[in-house]
Curated annotation (Swiss-Prot):
Keywords: Isomerase, tRNA processing. One of its GO terms (biological process) is tRNA pseudouridine synthesis. Substrate binds at residue 111. This is tRNA pseudouridine synthase A. It catalyses: uridine(38/39/40) in tRNA = pseudouridine(38/39/40) in tRNA. The active site is at 53 (nucleophile). Formation of pseudouridine at positions 38, 39 and 40 in the anticodon stem and loop of transfer RNAs. InterPro entries: PsdUridine_synth_cat_dom_sf, PsdUridine_synth_TruA, PsdUridine_synth_TruA_a/b_dom, PsdUridine_synth_TruA_C, TruA/RsuA/RluB/E/F_N. Its EC number is 5.4.99.12. It comes from the Bacteria. Belongs to the tRNA pseudouridine synthase TruA family. CDD domains: PseudoU_synth_EcTruA (cd02570). Homodimer.
Length: 257
């Protein structure tokens, strides 16, 4: 058996999320596995670096799979992508060792959230942008966000459906910046809880509108009470940028540190 790592890009708008959940609806995982199976002429199971929810997009999701069929990377890339819908594409393929694991070998994961901040909702690229009509103070949001850095208990930003054994995560970097009418929030952590990024964004938006002071974010973190935090932000503006791996795995530079 040969193990391969793939970099996958997808528009999550029409999927019920990454994970295959029986016959409930289309998932990115099931769609990718079906295409890979056609190339391998055998069933294929993929393991991803980080599962995404319904409507969340992937810029460079990393997966691994095992196959008894040997194919050059180009054949896996082109053969699989031609069998995928236009909303999913394989960006790269790297043969790797059997001890590489897309999830457990990753040392960090990155997300990006983008929203349009103007009175009128977006018509172009609306599936990739959230929207907030009230003026936002991006600088205040950025300052407040820095209070979340470090290893903390993120229970205040954890969904009720989260199945993680504990809520401690290391938030390694977070930034909020404005580019004209678009506000971009970038987050990096060793791992994330269910809805963690969207719940953080929802709370930061309340700081941005002036509804809450910057110090409120630190109070939420210390309080560990989800009911006291802001609402869950829309999935529409969220992109899983991708995981990061140690250089020893010899993956493309965009996922290596």
């Amino acid at each position: 058996m040969m193990r391969y790592a793939l970099g996958v890009e997808y528009d999550g708008s029409e999927f019920l999320g990454w994970q295959q959940l029986g016959e409930m609806g289309p998932s990115v995982q099931a769609t990718l596995q079906q295409a890979l199976a056609s190339v391998a002429d055998a069933s294929v199971r993929v393991v991803c670096a980080g599962r995404t929810d319904a409507g969340v997009h992937g810029q460079c999701q990393v997966v691994h799979f095992d196959s008894a069929v040997t194919r050059p990377p180009r054949a896996w890339i082109l053969g699989t992508t031609t069998r995928l819908p236009s909303s999913v594409a394989v960006r790269w393929c790297v043969p790797t060792s059997e001890d590489f694991h897309a999830r457990f070998s990753a040392c960090a994961r990155r997300y990006r959230y983008r929203l349009l901040n103007r009175q009128v909702r977006p018509a172009l690229q609306h599936q990739f942008l959230s929207w907030e009509r009230y003026p936002l103070d991006a600088q205040a949001m950025h300052v407040a966000a820095q209070m979340l850095l470090g290893e903390n208990d993120f229970s205040a930003f954890r969904s009720a459906q989260c199945q993680a054994l504990h809520a401690r995560r290391e938030l390694q970097a977070i930034s909020v910046r404005r580019d004209a009418e678009v506000i971009e929030i970038c987050v990096q952590a060793n791992a994330f809880l269910h809805h963690m990024v969207r719940n953080i964004v929802g709370s930061l938006l309340m700081v941005g509108t002036g509804e809450r002071p910057m110090e409120w974010i630190a109070e939420l973190l210390a309080g560990r009470d989800r009911t006291m935090a802001g609402p869950t932000a829309s999935a529409r503006g969220l992109v899983f940028v991708g995981p990061l791996y140690p250089e020893k795995w010899h993956l493309p530079m965009e996922v290596s540190v």
